[in-house]
Amino acid sequence: MPKVVFQIEGGKPVTVDCNVGDNLLELARRANVAIDAPCSGNGSCGKCRIKLVEGELESYPSRHISDEEYAEGWRLSCSSKVVGNCTVFVPDIASAYQSRMKTADLSSPQEVAIFDACQSQLKQSGIHFTNQFRAVVVTMAEPSLDDTMPDNERLTWALEEALGVEKVEIPFCVMVKLAHVLRENSFHVCVKGELLGDTFRCMEVCAPEDTAIVGCAIDIGTTTVTMVLTDLTTGKILAKGSSGNGQIRYGADVINRIIEQGKPGGRKKLQDAILKETLNPIIANLCKSAGVTCPSILRMSVGANTTMNHLLVGVDAQSVRMDPYIPSFFLWNGLLAQDLKIPANPLAPVLIAPNIGSYVGGDITAGTLASGIWDSDALSLFIDLGTNGEIVFGNRDFLVSCACSAGPAFEGGDISCGMRATDGAIEACTVDKVTMEPTVSIVGDADQKAVGICGSGIIDIISELYRCGIVNAKGLFIREGERVRRDHHGMGRYVIAFENESETGREVSINEVDIDNFIRAKGAIFSAIATLLQSVDMPVEAIENVYVAGGIGSGINMKNAVNIGMFPDVELEKFHYIGNSSLSGAYAMVMSDEAAAKTAEVAANMTYLELSTYPGYMDSFVAACFLPHTDKRLFPHSIQEA
C-alpha cells in the first residue's frame, strides 16, 4: 500500500496510507490536510497547487501550470493520482483563503464601532436592549441533623426569596452536580439562569465569584467565521475573533458544499468542519481571552446563509439547490448548545436568524435588522457582498429580497491571485494612465509585500484599467507595456507586483479570465438590483440610501464600484459601508429579547424573489456583463479617459 507524505509549509508532515489511483485532493481531505480548492476539485480554479518533491504522480497538464512550473514539480492536486510512494509539498494557504484564528484588539474603537452603532440604531427604533438572563449570589444555611432540607429545596427557597419568583426549575444537568458545588463553596454560590415569567430556570450553579453571564454572537460566512462574546447585562464586547471556515476545503461556494454533503458521510464531515474544527476552538479561545468560563455562555445567536444553517445543524441541504428550491427549514426554534455539542452552557438557547429563501438566509435577516431599513421611511438598498451576493430593497412599508450567483469572486475566488482581505492582500490601487504603473495599498504592516488581491482591490484595479484605456468594455487588454504581459495563447494579464516585489516570489497579476469572471460577478449584482427595482416598479432615482456590507474589504471605493457597473449610478453620498452586518445583527439578537423577536418579524414580512425563474433576469444579466454596461446611459458618471 503506497504512502503519501504531505509536507505542509510551516507545519508538521502528515503521512497517509492510500491506494494506487487515489485522487490526491481527496486524500488530503481525508487526512485533514488543508489544500486550497475553491472549485472543489473540478479543475477550474487552479489553486490546489502542490509540489512533487519525491516519487511520481499521475497528472495531466493544466492551463494553470506553466511548462517551467511543471518541470519544477508543481501539479494540481485535483488532477493528480497516486501511483506509488511520494512526498508532496503543500503551500501554506492560511494567509490566503483560510485564515488562522485571530483575536481582535478591543482597544481599537473600530472593532466595537459596528456594535455600538447597531445598538444605537435599534434603540432609536424602540428596541430595548434587555434580556431575562440573570446571575444571583445566594447564601444558604448548611444542612445539619436539625436542618434536613434536601439540596434542591434549599436552593429553590433561596432563589424564590432572592428573585421574588414563584417557581424554580433545576434541570438534570444542573442537579447532577449540585451537591458537589454547594459543599465545595460552603453553600455560598452564584446561580445563573433565565427568568421565564414567574419562573426562574437554573442553568449553572458555580463559585460565588463567577458572576459573568455571557452571550455569544456568530456570523458563519461561507469563507470566514467571526464571533463575539458579550456581557449579557451591560452589552460590553468581551472578546472578538475569527477564523477561516473549516469547510473551505470542500469548495468556496455553497453549491460545491451541498454536493459534497450529499456524498456518503458528507453531511457529518461538513458539520464536523464547522463545529469541531471552527466554532468550538474559537469559543474556547475567546473564553480564555475574556477570562470567562464556557458554561457562562447562556445564549448564542447565529447569522448564516441558508446552506450554512443546514450544514451547521446536520440537515440535508440538497433541497436548497433543487427545483423548486425549498429548504428544509426557515425558522428553527428550541435548539440548544448541547444539541450541537458546543462548548457553552448545555442549556444555552441557540437562536438561528430565520432564512428567507434558498439563497437569502439568516445572515441577510440579521443584516437587515442591523441596517435599520425595516424601520425607515427612506427607500434603501441593502447589499451583502460575500461569497454570494444578496440584496434587499424597501423601507418600513415593504421589503423585497433576492440572491444572485455572483460566485466567490468578491472574496478572491475565481481570481488567479485572489485572496481574502488578510495580510498581504492588495486592497486598493490606482494606475498612472501614462506609465501604467500601479500604486497599491496592502493589508498588514508597513513592510508587508503583496501576496494576492482581495475584493476591494480587484474592483479598484479593474476600474483603473478601464479608466486608463488599458482594457476595453469586454475586459480585454488593448494597450501594451512592461506591466502588460501575454502568455503563449495570447491571453493578456496586468502585473501589479513582479516576482521580486511579492511576498511569495511569484508575480501578483490579474488576467483576462480573472476580469471576465469578475465582470460576470459584478453583472450579477447590478442585474439583481435592477430586477428588484423592476419588481416593485421603482426607478434607480428612487434609491435614497445604499448600505453595503460583507467581507469584500472596508476600504471599498464606491466610485470605482459604480465606474465598472457593479452598483447603480447614484450620488456617492448615498453609499454607506456598514461592515459585518450579519454579526452586528446576531449581537443584537443575543443581547435583546425584543431584537430577537423583531428579526423573526422582519423575515416574515420580507418577500423573496427567485431570480432563476424571474422573467427577464437573464437578459438583464447578459447586458450587465460589460464595463460598465451595454447601455452606458445607465452610468453617466463612468469614466474611460481618451
Language model features: what each stretch is:
Residues 27-31, 36, 47-97:
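Iron-sulfur (Fe-S) cluster-binding segments and ferredoxin-like electron-carrier domains
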Residues 69-71, 76-217, 222, 234, ...:
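Nucleotide/phosphate-binding catalytic cleft detector across ATP-hydrolyzing
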Residues 218-222, 227-255, 319-332, 366, ...:
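Glycine-rich phosphate-binding loop of actin/hexokinase-like ATP-binding domains
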Residues 246-289, 414, 425-430, 517, ...:
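N-terminal phosphate-binding loop and adjacent alpha-helix
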Residues 304-319, 490, 538, 550-569, ...:
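Short glycine/threonine-rich loop-to-helix capping motif typified by GTGT followed
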Residues 342-343, 354-370, 519-523, 575-610:
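Glycine-rich phosphate-binding/hydrolytic loop that grips phosphoryl groups
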Residues 395-397, 404, 538-602:
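Catalytic phosphate/nucleotide-handling subdomain of diverse soluble enzymes
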Residues 466-536:
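A contiguous, well-structured pocket-lining segment that forms one wall/lid of small-molecule binding clefts
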